[in-house]
Amino acid sequence: MDNSRRDFLRKVSMATAGMAIFTGLPSFNVIANTAKKPFFKISLAEWSLHRTLQSGAMTNMDFPSKAKNDFGINAVEYVDQYFKDKARDLNYLKELKSRTQDLDVRNVLIMVDTAGSLATTNDAERSKSIENHYQWIEAAKFLGCHSIRVNLRGIGTPEELASSSVDSLGRLSEYGQKNGIGVIVENHGGVSSNGKWLVDIMKQVNNPFCGTLPDFDNWCVSLQTTGTGKECENMYDKYLGTKEMMPYARGVSAKSRTFDAAGSEVNIDFMRLIKIVKAEKTRAFQGFIGIEYAGNVLSEDDGIRATKKLLERVAMNM
């Protein structure tokens, strides 16, 4: 083979290899987009607007459009008390579902606060409470939610409340499983804000449709009365509690109250918590972190915007 032909073949081979290398690489834009894509989507908890709702300035039916049009959020988390007599009102639910479909807004979950205690040691009361929750599982299914959020509150020792809670969650989760709806517990004061206690409940129930909803700031296990009112005397560590709850979490509630001049939450390290969420989440996690502004310094609208901006900033810097 002469030298000219040998050189030609060598150059063709090098060019082909180079093309193969570069063809296999994503473009710069793809790399940039992949690096910046957050692992979670933002939803809005209706409680963020509780003062507006309670004043009558808006209704539950208005909530999805406000989330989308005022805040650019296309996923919502309802609170049952703002449509508490509508769980089995098919016409109402059809209208709500139609509006969210027209808006391209996702119905994520329903927070249930008015259906009774699931941790009460009174068997008759507990059975009634369980039955009251069934309608919300059905409503959640109709709306396309992934879960209902429930509470574990009651009077008794931690052991007594645990026994009642396991019974309630076991029965509710079976019903939820039949309907494809999760039953998730929030740390919402009292013994439910003890992460270790709540995780033990999850282990005993042992149903994939029974899970948790870690809230960034609901960690007061017990209160004490002082001269100026009530103060928390036993505060569970929010970072430990979130880490403990995340393996069972189907969602996360990003509670916020007060912001500094830089836009960070004064008492809650969002970056640290969201790193925990990312590290400890499992396949149970449905992908949403819900804004729940509960402060009094900013207006509800401004508090929601500040929390959204903070979540977006954290996501971009992870």
Give the role of each language-model region:
Residues 140-160, 179, 184-191, 290:
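Active-site groove signature of glycoside hydrolases
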Residues 78-81, 112, 150-153, 188, ...:
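Active-site loop/turn elements of alpha/beta-hydrolase fold enzymes
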Residues 76, 108-110, 148, 252, ...:
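Hydrophobic residues within beta-strands of alpha/beta enzymes
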Residues 75-76, 170-276:
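Acidic/histidine-rich catalytic cores of soluble enzymes
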Residues 254-262, 286-298:
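Active-site clefts of carbohydrate-active enzymes
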Residues 2-142, 160-163, 177, 196, ...:
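N-terminal pre-domain/capping segments
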